[in-house]
Amino acid sequence: MTAKPAAAAARATVYGYPRQGPHRELKKAIEGYWKGRVDADALRETAAELRRGTWQQLAEAGVHEVPTGDFSYYDHVLDTSVMVGAVPERHRASVEADALDGYFAMARGTQDVAPLEMTKWFDTNYHYLVPELGPDTVFSADSAKQVAEFREALALGWTPRPVLVGPLTYLLLAKAAPGVAADFEPLTLLDRLLPVYAEILADLRAAGATWVQLDEPALVQDRTPAELNAAARAYRELGGRADRPQLLVASYFGRLGEALAVLAKAPVDGLALDFTESGAGNLDDLAAAGGLPGKRLVAGVVNGRNIWINDYAKSLATLGTLLGLADRVDVSASCSLLHVPLDADAERGIDPETARWLAFAKQKTEEIVVLARGLGSGTDAIASELAANRADLASRTGAALTRDPAVRARTAAVTEADGRRSQPYAERSAAQRAGLGLPLLPTTTIGSFPQTTELRTARAELRAGRIDEAEYEERVKDEIREVLSFQEKAGIDVLVHGEPERNDMVQYFAEQLDGYLATQHGWVQSYGTRYVRPPVLAGDISRPEPMTVRWTTYAQSLTARPVKGMLTGPVTMLAWSFVRDDQPLGDTARQVALALRDEVNDLEANGTSVIQVDEPALRETLPLRAAEHAAYLEWATESFRIATSGVRPDTQIHTHMCYAEFGDIVQAIDDLDADVISLEAARSHMQVARELAAHGYPREAGPGVYDIHSPRIPGAEEAAALLRKGLEAIPAERLWVNPDCGLKTRGWPETRASLENLVAAARQIRAELPTGAA
C-alpha cells in the first residue's frame, strides 16, 4: 500500500553533529595549540573549516536546517557556562587575561588551579564539565560564539538553527561550587538565569535566527513537581517574550513523561521527541496529551546513539501515526549525532556483507532525508530505498555471525551458583591479607601507564610490516620492565604491568573475542581531545584463547610484589561498544561474562593473586528513569559476578569505576561482591567515600587521590589531605591509595612525580595513624 503524502512536506534536520573532522583535525589542532605548535588564529581557522565542511555536507544531503553552536573546542556545557558568565572565581583572572587559554584552564586545570569536575553526559560515553554555582553566582550574557557561528552558516547560504543547552538542563546538571553548602540547589538560580537566556535569544533573533533549539534532556529523567513547575515557569517566561525567535525545545535519551504535558502547554513553537526504543512511550503520551496543535514536532526516529541501519518501514509507520498530532512533523535522529562516528563508507576492513548493516553520522543523515521524503511525498518516492533497506535488514537477521549454538547452549546452562563466590567476604579477606602481606593503606594504580611515542611507533611499524611480531613483543616487554622498575622504586605495593600492548581497554579485548568487529575510523568524542573507537558487538561472544595471561605472567616473573591482572568487565564491554540491538542487553552481557570468566580463571591458574575487572560503565549505563533501575542492575551485577566468582577465596578481586555520581548505585556496588573497589574521587573531594560509608559498605575501597584528567601534579600534602577525608569515612584497614583512573593519557614526567607524591602521602598518613604503621 502506498502511504499518502503529509499535508505539509516533511523536512529533515539534525540536532548536532560530530566535531572532530574526518581525520580528527580538531584534536590535532587543539593539542598542537596546547604544545605551542599551533597559534590561536590557526586553531580558529581549523575550527571554521570543520564547521563549514559539516554544514555543506548536511545541506547537500538534503537537511533543511543545519545546527549551529553545537561545535565546541572542548565541551558544549562548558561553552554554556561561558555563555551565561558562570566562570568559577578561581578561573576568572585567566579567562579575563586570555579567553581561549582561560577556557582550556577551566577544562584541564593548571598546576596551581583545579579544573571543573567532569562526569558523564546522562547515560552516554561523552563527558561534560560540571557547572559550579552558588548563591552568589551572578550570570551575564555572552552570545558572541552563538551569534558568530550562526552568521558564519548564514553567510554561506545555509538555513542555520542555533542550538543551546536549555536553562533547566544547565541548572539540573550543575553542582554546588567549592565552599558552598553541599545541599545548595542550583535550580534556585532559575529566575536569575532566565533573563540571560532571554537576552541571548534576542541577540540571535536580531542576527536573523528564525528558530533556536533549546536542549532539555534532563527532563526525560524523573523530575519532582517543583522541577516540573520550574520548567513550566521557564518556558512561559521565555516563550512569552516578543523579541524571541521561534523556540524548539528538544528532549532526547528517553521518554519525556510528565514533562511532555508541561512543554505541550508552554508558549513554545515546537518540540523534538525521541521515538526510538529508548523513547518508548512518547508516542502514546503525545496522543494522550492531545498532540501539539499549532506546534512543530521533530520526530527522532533514527537512533542517534547506535550504528545499526534504520528499519524504514517501522520508522515510517511511527511517522505516519504522528501525522495529525502536530501542525507539522519533521524528521530527525533521536539525539545529536555527536555520539556516533562520522562515515561508515570510510571502513574498508569490514566484510562488505556486514558493512551493509552499519550507519554512522553521514549515513544516518541520509536515512533521515529518505524518511522525510517518504513521509512528505509517499512511499512510492522512496521505493528503491525501501527495497534496499529490506534486503539489508534480512541480511543481518540471517547472518551466521549473529548466532553461535555453542555460545547459546553455554549461556542457557548458567546457574545461580555460577555467580556466587565460594566463601563470604569476611573469610576471603582474611585469606587475602595472609597471602598478600600488604601494609595499611596499600598503594596501587588503576592499570594503564603512559602510552609513549615509542609504543605508538612500534604499533604503527607492526601494522605497516616494518617490524615483525617478535620485535614488537620485545619492545612491549621493554616497556613492561620499565613500568615495573619505576613502581618498585617508587614504593608502590600492588603493581601493574602498564598495559603497553593495549590500544584501548575495550577494543583490545574486542579484537580477541569472536562476535566483535573493529573499525578503522570509527572515532567518537569521549571528552575534550580524547577520542575512542568503540568496537562493534555484532554477534554471539566467545573467547578463542587467553587474552592477557602471557603479559601478566611475564610481568609477575620480574617482581616479588603482586602484579594485578587487568580485565574490562562485561557491562563496560557493552557500554563502550556499539552493541547489537536484536536481543536483550542482559543476554549479551552474560555471553561476555562467560568469556571473561575463562580469562579470570586462567590468570589465577597461572599465578595471578590479584585480578581487577574494571566496570567504569556500571553507573553510566543506569537507565535515566528509576523504574527501570532494578531490572538493569540485576543483570549488570550478575554478569560481573559470573565473570569473577570462579576463583579461590585467597584470590583478591578488584574493580574500578570512574566519571560518575555513585550515590544511587551503592547497593549495586555492594552486590558486585568485589573484594576491593577503586573509584574516581579527587575532583569531588571524596564524596564517594562518604556515600560508601553512609551505605555501610563492608569491603575495601580506594577513592582516588590523584586526578589524572588534568596535567597538574598534586603535591604529597594535597593527596594526604584527601586521604584524611577518606579516613573519616573508611577505616584504615579497608582504605587503599590510588589515582582516580588509568594513566594512559598522561605523560611520564607528571606520572612519576604524581605517583611519588601519592606514595609519600600514604607513608605520611600511615605514620599519623594510632598504630604508627610505616
Swiss-Prot record:
UniProt xrefs under InterPro entries: Cbl-indep_Met_Synth_N (IPR013215), Cobalamin-indep_Met_synthase (IPR006276), Met_Synth_C/arc (IPR002629), UROD/MetE-like_sf (IPR038071)
Catalytic residues (UniProt): H709 (proton donor)
Source domain of life: Bacteria
SUPFAM superfamilies linked: UROD/MetE-like
Chemical reaction(s) catalysed: 5-methyltetrahydropteroyltri-L-glutamate + L-homocysteine = tetrahydropteroyltri-L-glutamate + L-methionine
EC class: transferase
Residues noted as binding 5-methyltetrahydropteroyltri-L-glutamate in the record, renumbered to the chain: R24, E25, L26, K27, K120, W576, E620
Keywords: Amino-acid biosynthesis, Metal-binding, Methionine biosynthesis, Methyltransferase, Repeat, Transferase, Zinc
Positions with a binding annotation for L-methionine: I446, G447, S448, E499, D614
Binding site for Zn(2+): H656, C658, E680, C741
Any one Gene Ontology BP term: methionine biosynthetic process
Protein task: Catalyzes the transfer of a methyl group from 5-methyltetrahydrofolate to homocysteine resulting in methionine formation.
PANTHER family recorded: 5-METHYLTETRAHYDROPTEROYLTRIGLUTAMATE--HOMOCYSTEINE METHYLTRANSFERASE
Family listed: Belongs to the vitamin-B12 independent methionine synthase family.
Name of the protein in question: 5-methyltetrahydropteroyltriglutamate--homocysteine methyltransferase
Organism, as annotated: Streptomyces griseus subsp. griseus (strain JCM 4626 / CBS 651.72 / NBRC 13350 / KCC S-0626 / ISP 5235)
